């Protein structure tokens, strides 16, 4: 009697099964990675720089964290797809105080341990998973120390990762431990207990103003921006040399006569019940702006008396309006990036000869930040046809 053979899978079939399993694990591991973004849309004739910032309605339980990627490439920030819950926003509009989970009490101490009160404090909006960009900022334009004789200090502003209070611990639920270790290593992490979402940047704004007023009362100037910007700190300090930190100043890429978006299909839709005026007050694009210590302290008080608004940079413009202050436009702050001129479609905009004449450029990856830093600060420096000082006047395209 002939024995029946067992069926065997050929090597190609085994390889296919293994690859399918690996792909499934990869997709499962990346399914929940999410982080807010503050990158603005393209500038239009009547559109504001939208940076929606909706407040959290619950204090997240940070003891039970959802899975969070902390390794590999920088996560791509998603845009919101769900409708803006204005009813929930209005019901929770008075909830604006959240505990500080990680602090840097000695960041601006003048006891000699940290070098005294800083001339420039750099505050960068970040999210827990974005270690790659934080490290790029630390090692390039955001490095602490003396720059042209000015003392520069740095902090990153974070909230609790989205979904951290919804339960479901996983293999990547160690975000709090990692942030605490990062804080011990660099002493530059500020973490609050509100959920860090696309809509919560206004909370980050008011909590930072309150923190800086309490822990950095003698700071001369503050630069506040996103983690995907490149800042030419020497140009910024050159601009600030002639400014008095005791006088009011808030300078950046200023947007005026921006109209609220009334189209319900837009993710930046603002109903008339929330804002009924035809235009927003003048405001500086949230990608990066600089303010004096005097203005910071006044803003901290004014913003505590202004109802929160779901667009953080517009909200800051409302606080300035309450103080009867006007933001100062500066052409070297490019929070919408460097536009490609229509007359020169082949012109390379990612060029150190352009960046050396600017203060802020928004919309760079971590790799681009590293590369531009090396191009500008390498041993040879940028080779440009017309070297000239920067941050002293309007930016012009060289022919």
Swiss-Prot record:
Lumenal side: 30-399
Keyword Glycosyltransferase in annotation: yes
Listed GO MF terms: hexosyltransferase activity
GO biological processes: protein glycosylation
Class of the enzyme per the UniProt entry, highest EC level: transferase
Biased composition range(s): Pro residues: 38-51
Cellular component GO terms held in the UniProt record: Golgi membrane
Keyword Glycosyltransferase: yes
Membrane topology field: Single-pass type II membrane protein
Major localization class: Golgi
Catalytic activity, EC: 2.4.1.-
Protein's cellular compartments: Golgi apparatus membrane
UniProt region (Disordered), positions on chain: 35-55
InterPro entries named among the record's database cross-references: Glyco_trans_31 (IPR002659)
Transmembrane parts of this sequence: 13-29
Topological domains, Cytoplasmic: 1-12
Family label: Belongs to the glycosyltransferase 31 family.
PANTHER family in UniProt: BETA-1,3-N-ACETYLGLUCOSAMINYLTRANSFERASE, UDP-GLCNAC:BETAGAL BETA-1,3-N-ACETYLGLUCOSAMINYLTRANSFERASE 9
Stated name of the protein: UDP-GlcNAc:betaGal beta-1,3-N-acetylglucosaminyltransferase 9
């Amino acid at each position: 009697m002939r024995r029946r053979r067992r069926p065997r899978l050929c090597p190609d079939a085994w390889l296919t099964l293994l690859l399918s399993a690996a792909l499934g694990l990869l997709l499962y591991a990346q399914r929940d990675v999410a982080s807010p973004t503050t990158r603005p849309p393209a500038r239009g004739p009547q559109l504001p720089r939208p940076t929606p910032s909706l407040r959290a309605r619950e204090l997240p339980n940070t003891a039970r964290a959802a899975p969070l990627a902390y390794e590999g490439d920088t996560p791509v920030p998603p845009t919101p797809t769900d409708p803006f819950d204005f009813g929930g926003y209005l019901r929770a509009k008075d909830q604006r105080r959240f505990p500080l989970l990680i602090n840097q009490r000695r960041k601006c101490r003048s006891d000699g341990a940290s070098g005294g009160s800083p001339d420039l404090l750099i505050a960068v909006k970040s999210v827990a998973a974005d270690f790659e960009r934080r490290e790029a900022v630390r090692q390039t334009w955001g490095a602490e120390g003396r720059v042209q004789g000015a003392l520069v200090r740095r902090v990153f502003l974070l909230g609790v990762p989205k979904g951290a209070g919804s339960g479901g611990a996983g293999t990547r639920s160690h975000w709090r431990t990692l942030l605490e270790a990062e804080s011990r290593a660099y002493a530059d992490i500020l973490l609050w207990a509100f959920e860090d979402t696309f809509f919560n940047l206004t909370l980050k704004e008011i909590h930072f103003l309150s923190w800086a007023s309490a822990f950095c009362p003698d700071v001369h100037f503050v630069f506040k921006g996103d983690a995907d910007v490149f800042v030419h700190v020497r140009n910024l300090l050159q601009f600030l040399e002639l400014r008095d930190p005791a006088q009011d100043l808030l300078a950046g890429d200023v947007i005026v006569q921006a109209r609220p978006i009334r189209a319900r299909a837009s993710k930046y839709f603002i109903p008339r019940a929330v804002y009924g005026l035809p235009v927003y007050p003048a405001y500086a694009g949230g990608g990066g702006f600089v303010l004096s210590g005097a203005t910071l302290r006044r803003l901290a008080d004014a913003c505590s008396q202004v109802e929160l608004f779901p667009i953080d940079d517009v909200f800051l413009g409302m606080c300035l309006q309450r103080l009867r202050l006007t933001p100062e436009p500066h052409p070297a702050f490019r929070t919408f990036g460097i536009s490609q001129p229509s007359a020169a479609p082949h012109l390379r905009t990612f060029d150190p000869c352009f960046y050396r004449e600017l203060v802020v450029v928004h919309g760079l990856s971590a790799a681009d930040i590293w590369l531009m830093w090396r191009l500008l600060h390498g041993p040879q420096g940028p080779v440009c046809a017309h070297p000239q000082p920067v941050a002293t006047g309007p930016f012009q395209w060289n022919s």
